Amino acid sequence: MTNIRKSHPLMKIINNSFIDLPAPSNISSWWNFGSLLGICLALQILTGLFLAMHYTSDTATAFNSVTHICRDVNYGWILRYLHANGASMFFICLYLHVGRGLYYGSYMYMETWNIGVILLFAVMATAFMGYVLPWGQMSFWGATVITNLLSAIPYIGTNLVEWIWGGFSVDKATLTRFFAFHFLLPFIIAAMVMVHLLFLHETGSNNPTGIPSNADMIPFHPYYTINDILGLLLMIMTLLMLVLFSPDMLGDPDNYTPANPLSTPPHIKPEWYFLFAYAILRSIPNKLGGVLALVLSILILIIIPLLHTSKQRSMSFRPLSQCLFWLLTADLLTLTWIGGQPVEHPYILIGQLASILYFSIIIIFMPLTSLMENHLLKW
C-alpha cells in the first residue's frame, strides 16, 4: 500500500512542497527566512483576526478601542504588541530574505523574483494601512503626508487623493476603508505566497555556490525542517523579548496621543522599516521627483536580473562585488538613520549623498564591477 502522504490528493501537495521536496545539500541558514516569513504572515493574520474582533474603525472610537483591547480584553495587550512587533520581525526577515536573493543571485529565477517584489509592495502597503488604524497623532499625520504624495501625479493627482480619502481630508471614510483593505490584503498576500512557492518549486532552490545542484539533492524533511525550527525558535525568542520587555521600543511615542488634525507633531516619520525610503523621498527637493525616487527605490529590484553582467551567479567567489554589496547594506542603514532625523543641515546632505550612492551602486557600480571580475577571470 502506498503511503497516504504520497497518494492522497491534498497530502501529496504538502508532501511535494515540505517533506519529499528535493533541496540542495549545501544551503545555509540564509535560506531559513522564507519559512520564517510564512510563520510571520500566519502570526499576523491570527493576531490581527483577534484584534479585529474588538477594534472599531470609527474616528471617534478607534483610539479608545485600542486602549480597551490593551486594558480590558483578556490578553489583549499581548495580542496588540505581538501584532505591532510581529510587523517589525516580518520586515527584518523580508529585508534579509531580499538581501540573500541579491547576494546569491537568486533573482535569476525571474518569475519567483518578480512575484517576490510584488509581495514586498503588498506587505509595505498593508503595514502602512495598519499603522493608520490606532488613530494616534503619527497614524493621522503619516496617512495625511503619504497619501498626499499622490497629488504630485500630474493632472489626476488631486482627484486621486480625494478619491482615496473619501473626502477632502483624512477622516472617517479613510479610516474605514484602510481597515477593510488592511484586513483583506494579508489573505491576498497568502495566495501570492502560494504562487511564489509554485514558481520556486518549478526550478528548485538556488544554493550559495550559484552552481546547479541537481546532482546532489537531499529531502527537505528532516534536514531542513529541523534547521527551520531552530530559526523559528530564535525568531520567536527575539519577538517575545521585544513584546514582553520593551514593546514600545520600535514605536513612536506620538502615537499614544489621539489624532488631532489641528496640531502637527514636530517630526512626522513612518515606522522604522520605511525610513530608508522616506529618506530617499525627502532628499529630493521636488515633490514629483521625490515620489518617483521613493517608488523606484523598491521598483529597481525588478530590473536587477537585467543588470546581472557576471559570468558567475552568486557573489560567493566575487570579492569586489561583495565589497559593493556590503557598501549597499551600510548605505541602507545610513538612509534608515537619516529618515528618522529632522530636516536640517548635516542630515539633508548626508541623505542626498546616501540616496545618490544607493542608485549608483545598483545601476552603475555593480554591473561594471561584474564585468571587471569577468575580465580578471581570464588572467
UniProtKB/Swiss-Prot annotation:
Heme b b562 binds at residues 83, 182. GO terms for molecular function: metal ion binding; ubiquinol-cytochrome-c reductase activity. It comes from the Eukaryota. It is a multi-pass membrane protein. PROSITE patterns: CYTB_CTER, CYTB_NTER. One of its GO terms (cellular component) is respiratory chain complex III. PANTHER family: CYTOCHROME B. The cytochrome bc1 complex contains 11 subunits: 3 respiratory subunits (MT-CYB, CYC1 and UQCRFS1), 2 core proteins (UQCRC1 and UQCRC2) and 6 low-molecular weight proteins (UQCRH/QCR6, UQCRB/QCR7, UQCRQ/QCR8, UQCR10/QCR9, UQCR11/QCR10 and a cleavage product of UQCRFS1). This cytochrome bc1 complex then forms a dimer. Belongs to the cytochrome b family. Heme 1 (or BL or b562) is low-potential and absorbs at about 562 nm, and heme 2 (or BH or b566) is high-potential and absorbs at about 566 nm. This is Cytochrome b. It comes from Myotis pruinosus. The gene is MT-CYB.
